Amino acid sequence: MGIKYSNKINKIRTFALSLVFLGILVMYIGIFFRTHEVIMVLAMILGFLCIIASTAVYFWIGMISTRAIPVVCPECGKPTKVLGRVDACMHCDQPLTLDRSLEGKEFDEKYNLKGKKRVDG
């Protein structure tokens, strides 16, 4: 079948969700150190900072999501958002592009790189 691609917005949202779970896990581990107050407090603060970082990432991806170009996926027919020159459908992971020069070419996330590293095929 080939490499499975996923949508950039979904990747960042998954990262933010994992920060929430990591923060809760770190705080939960801190409870086991009730007898060592310093370790417990550090674990609670670290867990809290993970959750605050998650909030910042969710806010950031929300701002990016408002600027993303909405399109209808030709494969599944559902609305999705495209970031950059190439991206994948949020629902079916179908490779998408808005750049006519990339139509019919093999999907490569390197098309989104700026500068000298950019691949034009």
From Swiss-Prot:
Chief site of localization: membrane
Q: Which UniProt keywords apply?
A: Cell membrane, Membrane, Transmembrane, Transmembrane helix
Write out the annotated subcellular location: Cell membrane
One Gene Ontology cellular component term attached to this UniProt record is: plasma membrane
Q: Which InterPro entries does this chain map to?
A: UPF0295
Annotated transmembrane regions: 12-32, 41-61
Q: How does this protein sit in the membrane?
A: Multi-pass membrane protein
Top-level taxon of the source organism = Bacteria
Q: Does the keyword Transmembrane helix apply?
A: yes
- Record's family? Belongs to the UPF0295 family.
Q: Which NCBIfam families match?
A: PRK02935.1 (NF002796)
Record's protein name: UPF0295 protein BH0952
